[in-house]
Amino acid sequence: MKKQWEPPELEEMQVVILSLHQKWWQKMAAGEKVLELRKTKPQCKAPFRVLVYVTGGAGVLGEFICPEVLEIKNFEEAEKKSKVPAHDIHNYAAGSRNKVYGWEVADVKEYPRAVTLEELGIKR
C-alpha cells in the first residue's frame, strides 16, 4: 500500500530542488518514471520533498516525495523504474566512481502553473 503523507508531515520535511529536462518530468508526472538517477544524494534524511525545476526556464512545474534514496547496483532493474537505458546508466556511473543513487519518486503533484525560483525566494 502506498504511503500517504499528511500536511503536518509534509511541513516538517526537508525540501530539495531538482533540475530535470522536460521529457523526464513528463514521464514522472505520468507515473512512468518512479526512480530518478543521480550521482549524489542529499544530506537530509528521507523522506523529503523535491521541487522539480524544469530546465530551459520553464520554472518549477511540480513536486514529489522521495521516501528513500538507494545505491543502485542493478542497472537493468533501475532501467525499468527510471526509463533510462542500462548502458546509459553504466556510462553515467563511470564518471562518478561507479556510484549512482536512485531517488524513489512518490506522490507526484503537478502545479496548475509554473512557479518561478524568485517566487520561492531563490535567486539564481
Residue ranges of model-derived segments:
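Structured alpha/beta reader/binder surfaces that contact nucleic acids or chromatin modification marks
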Residues: 2-124
